[in-house]
């Protein structure tokens, strides 16, 4: 077996890993966007050229030189004899799936149905982007007419509204049956790999996260993706049970089931994430802490509350919905977020809101002219359901509402009265800024809060620096203590740390069992 | 274990920064709302800061009993003890 860490080895994100057996059959583990590398060359208004996107990314060494790309984007061939059986997508975060659009549509995408739902919701509520394209039309070569119009012949162009354009039909595969509502083709997971293969969900900050295990030659190989552990105390488990219910408690227990399934798999090579092993943290927040701190803030104000968290972080949605219910407030989602919720409910009935929960959900009617695909569907559905809320209704009763609104949504608050915004509360309940751009965004965001005298929680400015406090966020990644316990109990034969800045942490504990090379041959 | 003076010193610094008052105003006898001008949200924010700084959990029921800076110092001292 050969393990090639193509990206995401000594950095956080951008995972691209290939596993190849002795017969040159192989598979890929994630195909994410490496934000730090991307930021070295590109920013919001400086991007690779869509008409030569793979040429550009290959030249900048942002994607590996493998025969895995869509033929409408790239017609080159590399000296690489590997047959790619599938690409496993561990979870729908861009640093793991953000370049999946480039992949040859004939290579099946293996993931949970929830991950597919979140990816679809993300793609179909945003402007089209080749990097994340899941379906639609393939690009085409330039025509004579294009040449006449001065377009260079080595570029590819958008097919526009052409009815003759070739469809981009993805092959997708799931560990359990999923009802599709797009034109992807489903491939039986059992047919993907010549040996044993299983995908088991893990608990992470996005619904649908999963790990994979496959038999490769005479070894078992397992890949965790990103994960955190579930409730570690009886008190925390009680919180889940009381707040979210028995069925949803299962969400938090997914990680332990994944590792339980690996116990009898020997010899075992474990590719494992180590995001937090560098961080010095004296506080280990849980979802229960987030709930309790949010309750304090909600009880402390009669003003409008704005909460910032990604809706695909489903237990956070449940947490704030519950807090709203306890405080007789309606949770107001943007149409785009409502689209996410509908997609997730469609794929996994377990996540469906109860009638009581649903009665506390509203959808904001933003001052937008253009709605994209699923976002438009969600808006129209909210109108049909009678839960579409105008800014005026929030102005009338700010004490009855909590808006889910982040940085990109803030222009929409300009429709609210200044009196309502003055003294309103903003709760930052998501991760901190990691990149320089995000820090600039955060600084800009503080201007909004200051201008309207909105009281921030979870984020503050100290001597001109933005500080993210942790009261409203529980990390989606396993703690160093949790990881050490898991690895000691599992006792894998080989450990391959990825998604970490501190591989030495693993070497200190498991020494010669830790494999650090970019290419590992076993 | 931190002494009462050490706890008071940290509490004073947090209150001063959070409420924008001079440290000399933050005496053990000073009332958070009446003397230092804290509102209900300031209290929530302060409590979370104390929890983070001292690694203690402030029970919501106990919060109602806290009126002065000295009450906070005593509460933290007891929790740490």
From Swiss-Prot, chain B:
Pathway: Lipid metabolism; fatty acid biosynthesis. GO terms for biological process: lipid A biosynthetic process. It is found in: Cytoplasm. The modification O-(pantetheine 4'-phosphoryl)serine is found at residue 40. Keywords: Cytoplasm, Fatty acid biosynthesis, Fatty acid metabolism, Lipid biosynthesis, Lipid metabolism, Phosphopantetheine, Phosphoprotein. It comes from the Bacteria. GO terms for cellular component: cytosol; membrane. 4'-phosphopantetheine is transferred from CoA to a specific serine of apo-ACP by AcpS. This modification is essential for activity because fatty acids are bound in thioester linkage to the sulfhydryl of the prosthetic group. The keyword Phosphoprotein applies. Residues 5-80 form the Carrier domain. GO terms for molecular function: acyl binding; acyl carrier activity. Belongs to the acyl carrier protein (ACP) family. Carrier of the growing fatty acid chain in fatty acid biosynthesis. PANTHER family: ACYL CARRIER PROTEIN, CARRIER DOMAIN-CONTAINING PROTEIN. This is Acyl carrier protein. The lineage of its organism: Bacteria, Thermotogati, Thermotogota, Thermotogae, Thermotogales. The gene is acpP.
């Amino acid at each position: 077996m050969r393990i090639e860490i193509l990206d995401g080895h000594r950095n956080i994100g951008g995972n691209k890993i290939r596993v190849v057996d002795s017969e040159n059959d192989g598979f890929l583990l994630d195909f994410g966007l490496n934000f730090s590398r991307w930021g070295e060359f590109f920013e919001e208004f400086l991007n690779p050229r869509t008409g030569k996107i793979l040429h550009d990314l290959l030249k900048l060494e942002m994607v590996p030189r493998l025969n895995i790309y869509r033929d409408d984007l790239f017609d080159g061939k590399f000296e690489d004899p590997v047959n790619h059986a599938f690409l496993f997508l561990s979870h729908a975060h861009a640093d793991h799936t953000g370049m999946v659009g480039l992949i040859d549509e004939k290579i099946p995408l293996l993931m949970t149905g929830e991950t597919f739902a979140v990816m679809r919701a993300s793609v179909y509520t945003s402007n089209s982007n080749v990097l994340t394209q899941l379906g639609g039309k393939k690009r085409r070569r330039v025509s004579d007419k294009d040449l006449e119009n001065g377009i260079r012949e080595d570029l590819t162009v958008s097919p526009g509204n052409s009815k003759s354009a070739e469809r981009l039909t993805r092959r997708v595969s799931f560990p359990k049956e999923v009802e599709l509502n797009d034109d992807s083709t489903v491939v039986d997971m059992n047919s993907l790999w010549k040996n044993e293969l299983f995908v088991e969900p893990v608990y992470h900050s996005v619904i649908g996260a999963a790990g994979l295990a496959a038999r490769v030659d005479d070894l078992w190989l397992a890949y965790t993706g990103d994960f955190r552990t579930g409730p570690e105390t009886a008190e925390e488990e009680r919180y889940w049970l009381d707040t979210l219910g028995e069925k949803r408690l299962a969400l938090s227990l997914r990680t332990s089931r994944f590792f339980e399934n690996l116990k009898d798999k020997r010899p075992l090579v474990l590719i494992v994430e180590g995001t937090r092993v560098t961080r010095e943290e004296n506080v280990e927040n849980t979802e229960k802490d987030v709930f309790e701190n949010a309750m304090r803030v909600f009880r402390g104000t009669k003003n409008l509350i704005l909460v910032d968290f990604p809706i695909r972080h489903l237990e956070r949605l449940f947490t704030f919905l519950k807090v709203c219910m306890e405080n007789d407030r309606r949770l107001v989602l943007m149409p785009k977020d409502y689209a996410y919720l509908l997609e997730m409910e469609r794929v996994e009935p377990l996540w469906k809101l109860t009638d009581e929960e649903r009665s506390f959900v509203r959808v904001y009617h933003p001052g937008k002219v253009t709605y994209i695909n699923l976002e438009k569907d969600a808006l129209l559905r909210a109108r049909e359901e009678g839960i579409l809320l105008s800014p005026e209704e929030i102005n009338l009763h700010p004490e009855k509402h909590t808006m889910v609104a982040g940085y990109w949504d803030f222009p929409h608050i300009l429709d609210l009265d200044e009196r309502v915004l003055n003294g309103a509360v903003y709760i930052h309940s998501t991760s901190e800024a990691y990149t320089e751009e995000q820090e600039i965004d955060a600084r800009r965001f503080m201007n909004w809060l200051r201008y309207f005298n909105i009281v921030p929680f979870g984020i503050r400015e100290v001597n001109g620096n933005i500080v993210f406090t942790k009261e409203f966020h529980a990390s989606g990644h396993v703690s160093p203590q949790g990881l050490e316990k898991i690895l000691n109990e599992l006792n894998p034969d080989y450990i391959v740390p990825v998604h970490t800045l501190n591989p030495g942490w693993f070497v200190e504990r498991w020494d010669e069992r830790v494999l650090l090379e970019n290419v590992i041959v076993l | 274990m931190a002494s009462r003076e050490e706890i008071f010193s940290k509490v004073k610094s947090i209150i001063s920064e959070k409420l924008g008052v001079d440290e000399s105003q933050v005496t053990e006898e000073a009332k958070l709302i009446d003397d230092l001008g804290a509102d209900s949200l300031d209290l929530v924010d302060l409590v979370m800061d104390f929890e983070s700084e001292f690694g203690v959990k402030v029970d919501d029921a106990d919060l109602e009993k806290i009126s002065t800076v000295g009450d906070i110092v005593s509460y933290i001292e007891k929790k740490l003890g």
